[in-house]
Amino acid sequence: MDRFLVKGAQGGLLRKQEEQEPTGEEPAVLGGDKESTRKRPRREAPGNGGHSAGPSWRHIRAEGLDCSYTVLFGKAEADEIFQELEKEVEYFTGALARVQVFGKWHSVPRKQATYGDAGLTYTFSGLTLSPKPWIPVLERIRDHVSGVTGQTFNFVLINRYKDGCDHIGEHRDDERELAPGSPIASVSFGACRDFVFRHKDSRGKSPSRRVAVVRLPLAHGSLLMMNHPTNTHWYHSLPVRKKVLAPRVNLTFRKILLTKK
């Protein structure tokens, strides 16, 4: 499930690249670029069908990119949930907290954990594993997300960033275990961090074309819905931000297919 880690674990190269914008591209910031982002507060859920009552959504659109953003939890509730996550989530240790790149082992620049329904399996750094059973705080978040979106989720990947030096490199959530066409719900608690989308055709030193980067600051208690076909056309990352000193916990809720035996 974390095949993307291979690209992000080579010394300090990733950090240097993530702190720079590609030459000739102007980043589109949420609410700033009229063509790449559109602020449309609505009382409806993103995805399949509407919801009679719920938060106001900002819809982010670009070529092949379809996302919806809202602040799902007020500060007091978000603070409470964040403290529960800090106490209750059990993160990977040992070999599961490292990744092998070209025969060498590297520490993952963040903490990770997975929880989900019984019977599920997933691929993580070349290993096929089963998630831990749901705990109350995760069920609380999952059920609230489902209530406002109309979507169901059976798995969550949790990433904890101790400060702005922890990061994740450019990747796409395109693992074979994901239900085709299903959205991914990204919920954030703690420090606000920039979330960066880059089109697959505009990556590298010699991109085939120029497509504006889309950057979204993900606030404490926020929800970002990444709808199909976003992960087909766009890579995303959480770049290094050295001025950020506080921790952040991000949960990406997914719908995983049950492996046939």
From Swiss-Prot:
Its EC number is 1.14.11.33. Keywords: Dioxygenase, DNA damage, DNA repair, Iron, Magnesium, Metal-binding, Nucleus, Oxidoreductase. Binds 1 Fe(2+) ion per subunit. Residues 1-57 are annotated as: Disordered. Changing residue 110 to A: Loss of activity toward N1-methyladenine adduct in either ssDNA or dsDNA. Substrate binds at residues 102-104, 122-124, 174. Changing residue 122 to A: Decreases activity toward N1-methyladenine adduct in either ssDNA or dsDNA. Residues 152-257 form the Fe2OG dioxygenase domain. Disulfide bonds: none annotated. It catalyses: a methylated nucleobase within DNA + 2-oxoglutarate + O2 = a nucleobase within DNA + formaldehyde + succinate + CO2; an N(1)-methyl-2'-deoxyadenosine in double-stranded DNA + 2-oxoglutarate + O2 = a 2'-deoxyadenosine in double-stranded DNA + formaldehyde + succinate + CO2 + H(+); an N(1)-methyl-2'-deoxyadenosine in single-stranded DNA + 2-oxoglutarate + O2 = a 2'-deoxyadenosine in single-stranded DNA + formaldehyde + succinate + CO2 + H(+); an N(3)-methyl-2'-deoxycytidine in double-stranded DNA + 2-oxoglutarate + O2 = a 2'-deoxycytidine in double-stranded DNA + formaldehyde + succinate + CO2 + H(+). GO terms for biological process: DNA alkylation repair. Belongs to the alkB family. This is DNA oxidative demethylase ALKBH2.
